[in-house]
Amino acid sequence: MIFSQGSSPLKGDFSKIKFSIASPESILAHSRGEVLKPETINYRTFKPERDGLMCEKIFGPTKDWECYCGKYKRVRYKGIICDRCGVEVTTKSVRRERMGHISLAVPVVHTWFFRSVPSKIGALLDLSTKELERIIYYEVYVVINPGEPGEKQGIKKFDRLTEEQYFQIITEYEDNQDLEDNDPAKFVAKMGGEAIHMLLKGLNLDEIALNLRKVLKESGSEQKRADALKRLKVVEAFRKSYEPQKRTRKKSTGLFPEEDSPELYIYEGNKPEYMVMEVVPVIPPELRPLVPLEGGRFATSDLNDLYRRVIIRNNRLKKLIDIRAPEVILRNEKRMLQEAVDALFDNSRKANAVKTGESNRPLKSLSDALKGKQGRFRQNLLGKRVDYSGRSVIVVGPELKLHQCGLPKSMAIELFQPFVIRRLVERGIAKSVKSAKKLIDKKDPVVWDVLEKVIDGHPVLLNRAPTLHRLGIQAFQPTLIEGKAIQLHPLVCTAFNADFDGDQMAVHVPLSPEAQLEASLLMLSSHNLILPQSGKPVTVPSQDMVLGMYYLTKARFGDVGQGQLFYSMEEVIIAYNEERVGLHAQIFVKYDGKVDQVSDPVRLVDTLVPEEQAERRAWLKSQIEQKKLLVTTVGRVIFNQHMPEEIGFINKLINKKVAKELIAQLSSEVGNVETARFLDNIKEVGFDYAMRGGLSIGLSDAIVPETKVKHIKNAQRDSAKIIKEYNRGTLTDNERYNQIVDVWQKTSNLVADESYEKLKKDRDGFNPLYMMLDSGARGSREQVRQLTGMRGLIARPQKSMSGQPGEIIENPIISNLKEGLTVLEYFISTHGARKGLSDTSLKTADAGYLTRRLHDVAQDVIVTIDDCGTTRGLHVERNIEEETSGQIKFREKIKGRVAARDIVDVINDKVVVKAGEIITDELAAAIQDNIGVEEAEIRSVLTCESKVGICAKCYGTNLSVHKLVEIGEAVGVIAAQSIGEPGTQLTLRTFHQGGAAQGGIAETETKAFYEGQVELEDVKSVEHSIITEDGIEETRQIVIQKNGKLNIIDPDSGKVLKRYVVPHGAHLNVEHGQMVRKEQVLFSSEPNSTQIIAEMPGFAKFIDIEKGVTYKEEVDPQTGFAQHTIINWRSKLRASETREPRVAIVSESGEIRKTYPVPIKSNLYVEDGQKIVPGDIIAKVPRNLDRVGGDITAGLPKVTELFEARIPTDPAIVSEIDGYVSFGSQRRSSKEIRVKNDFGEEKVYYVQVGKHVLATEGDEVKAGDPLTDGAVSPQDILRIQGPNAVQQYLVNEIQKVYQINAGVEINDKHLEVIVRQMLQKVRVEEPGDTDLLPGDLIDRSTFIEANEAVAEKVRVIDRGDAPARIIEGQLYKQRDITKLNRELRRNGKSLITIEPALQATSHPVLLGITSAALQTESVISAASFQETTKVLTDAAVAGKVDHLVGLKENVIVGKLIPAGTGLRKYRSIRLRDNEAEEAEAVEAASDEEI
């Protein structure tokens, strides 16, 4: 990196940084002198040796304002250079910035440019790395100029010669060696860096580029073109970065005595020969310090050792050259010098790295100082240690307000010391800073008073590591406390993910007024009540507080004073204080305000008022109906004392869910201030009543239901029945296993439900265990099941970490934790429990790494403009299936977005939301309830067209403030935090289940969700008689078509209420047009296998189904029944042979009517020659059911796979066109599937044998439909259905993992931001007339700009009588040529013939987040992410400029980030005092009058 001498890099006023290869001139220009000796300091005086690696003359004095010999001391001699020792009198800090250099005896190749992949030097010289290595390390000669001897011997430039060959030519043509070196007839061959230097210097890059482009256009060989393209990229990079005429004269700096010598200009741009170094820069000594240890020894930086080796070898080589040593010795010394310089620049690349003497570890070279977590970028530039900070253990501060924290006095006095000292001096309490410090050290009482004043209104920042999202750092108003621990408000724990079991937190003091202002306005905890990731409240009461509120608002029948009538709320509280009425008593209160309640109050009158008081009953009912009376409990009256007026009276049992909804409602209706006040009040109430209720649990509170024994007996009976069937041979082993697991899963859930009900009824619902559970304070139904029901089935953990479904051990644990486990049961359950704990620690690292990659890819996405003006948007539909399965509701998808088109109610054609309007929470809720709105088109980040960053309209509202996002908001970072933070949460959640298997009762019956009329779409079914378990024959409708749909429609409006996909082989229970009621069974299907069903009558005929070859007959030892399973037959046959097992249905005459391929592992259900009726099962293909739910271990790798856009391990083959399927010929290892459309277009796919083919002969498929099973690759979706489809697919798939596996809510817009970044690049196909290269990966905006640049240009085909400057084949502006043609026509000359310039073509590329982060336009950002040396090498060669637009680059160079209040437009704001100006104007006017 070159800074021109005139502008010191330390001044902050630069706006971009250019990277280039340092030329020898620039290295010398930065250097203050040559380092000649390897010595560092004198062993006796410990002062730096002159001309050594620490020399004061070169690098500056080691003491402030003092020269080496001591002649000049004090600041008054500033700038004088001592005449005795030559040291300039200045501050010692210059030793951090002044550089030196070493002049090498022979040129040395820079290892970065030679060892990078592809090798930059290799690409320019067209030599392989192996050959280059032999030249550089002095093994072979390379011909630089063949001259006459070369021509005679047939030797060309760049040929490699061995020593014998070289000496043979030299001796043969002795007189040739007397010629001048630059004589073209002289034969020149060299080795080492010198040879490479001469070769690079002699290159003509323009000529090479022309030839390579020719190869690209004309060559037929793919390999040649690929090689040419690789070389062309490097050649073009050099050509673009170097224009030799650009010489900038350097401004005088006043630093050099020889300032005005003419050599002091710097070449801007790179010459190829700069990759070979003649001068090595020496970095400032303070950056490679010598630190004295006790005992007179020194610890040194590895760099000093590496420099020492270079200097020693260089000096030795100079001596050897002077004494004319033999060539062999010189060559050895030169090679050693090359190796020493290699080690200095990059020691880790070498196989034989230089090691230290004692510990035998490789020395840390300059490259290692930049790389990795401990390197310069990540250790010192992105994460610095901070002054004015402290850390301590946290304890709970229940009496704090939401915006406060308790700060120990001893910490506060340290942190605020400068402020306190200033106050003490200002007030005259202390005379000087020194005496003020003494006062503070003495802990004088006056100090505490001053500290109180200083702290008032000065916020501090609290941070808890790991800071996973922006709520991990919040501002608080400190209050001074005794003790040594920081007190934290209990409601902010969720945001920090803190608990009080020994967590520590750091305190930081914002110093400047701007920082204090930002802290108190933007970061104050009472302003951060909403999670940016989902828009839901984060300051939600938990544990004790919830329990207290629940206890307070719970009603108990028959409590003291039940059914009394009160005149006002105050009266109720007086009565309660007088103990006339119980806390849980249900009472009547006069109230006519707004009420939010669930139950029907009129019905309660009958239970609360005795029958004999009929008149009173009637009067109460009439009052309630007129909304003048309220039926509530005493506790709810107390709770509602703290409710803001606007919300009204909350007449509900308050549990965590209700509390959360309430806080969300408050925050949007009454604002943060009121909400914070309310939160503090309910915190007090919650803790208070949790204490008063005295709620604690004992063993007797866990009640085991008596029916448990009965259920277990039933289950044992059912599983015995299944085993009996298996023994009879009607079930396969796989089916037996699946059914047994199902039985126990159902039983386990049944027992759990009953134990839950039992707890609910115990003590009128006041069982402490049940209250803790029901209020949401602690525990889950899952835990109750294990405590009082049965532990149930346990997963068998897998060896692999890839998160495959763990198999379930089919013997359940029948005991629960209250009864205690048997030894065997305990042993079985240990395994899962331990795995949970070890998984946790392993996965946290993965989640952290995912977060880092997300941040890196999205860090420069900032809202830059208000509206990009795009007309495109995302299409969102209401999907009832997803909503019922607990996925995101339609409302959540459209909330906070801007409508791209009008949203219309189809039933009455009314516009609900106009295009360009924000869909607020109210509008979204109205749309959710209005079934007339089926779909909406919303603006999205995915379709945003702004060139840099994104626009506010496409992003929508900022979730944490419910307003349109502001310009300057760093939405990329927020997106990365929102996705990464739950990732780390998820991984930590596995072990709470204790390894108990969950989920996975596969639903066999599908029931109607609404009542309505059945409509069958593409459902073909046949009647088929089956024998049920009880031995009765029944006729069923069996579906024989794939992908049929069953819709339930509203008979009045004809609207589709719900769609179901009817699986192949399902038993259909309803008919077309039939009316169904809610919960009626529509169809049932077998979940554990895919069935192959006969569609027509005939006889079964086996084709290629041979015993021992394509199928094996397994006789079950227990049952004696034979089961036929298709096996992988490839190993059984010779290479040329092939088989394709299939079952055909033939007519009586033997004509084949339909064939069904049977995949490997399927079980046959028919015999050869058996009579078939439609609906018969031919074979079943077992499915692997993913039975272990809940554990995101499967989820995190899945998320990573999607974000990295990896191709799945066994991807589905996808049809590229719409058409009909037919099967082609069968080869040994694959069969061919053809898809042909009506236009005669045909695509052929080869499927590996044994892969299950989903399509059958004659099926109609759409482009993008999978033809075989397996996951669909996102790359295929992009290729076939385009970028929009793949974006939607990625967002939906990632959303599914978070939603289903973990129940975490993340707003779509965050995922969209990341997915947008993954599709920012395009690959150039044909460059046309632009200066792009084919195969280049560039930003979409760069591509559009390149095309716009040639849009107004034309190419000259025939120059006619044009002036000489017009060259055929070149591009010119259209208007210039038109002007010339006008003149030519006027003069009667022949005109210039032109054609429009060709634009480039490209296709979008989907990059994973790692590669997207490395491909970023900013060099600094990419270098600080991964592969630092590679990024810097490429940047230097191409002369890249970093414009510092992202956040990361600016942090690294120490500037304000260009987001939020750091936006460039805010830097030049001038404030005006309007009142003062008006006053002045009035004064001026009155003066004039006078």
Curated annotation (Swiss-Prot):
One of its GO terms (cellular component) is DNA-directed RNA polymerase complex. GO terms for molecular function: DNA binding; DNA-directed RNA polymerase activity; magnesium ion binding; zinc ion binding. Binds 1 Mg(2+) ion per subunit. CDD domains: RNAP_beta'_C (cd02655), RNAP_beta'_N (cd01609). Its cofactor is Mg(2+); Zn(2+). Zn(2+) 1 binds at residues 67, 69, 82, 85. Transmembrane segments: none annotated. Mg(2+) binds at residues 499, 501, 503. Zn(2+) 2 binds at residues 868, 944, 951, 954. Disulfide bonds: none annotated. DNA-dependent RNA polymerase catalyzes the transcription of DNA into RNA using the four ribonucleoside triphosphates as substrates. Belongs to the RNA polymerase beta' chain family. This is DNA-directed RNA polymerase subunit beta'. It comes from Chlorobaculum tepidum (strain ATCC 49652 / DSM 12025 / NBRC 103806 / TLS). The lineage of its organism: Bacteria, Pseudomonadati, Chlorobiota, Chlorobiia, Chlorobiales.
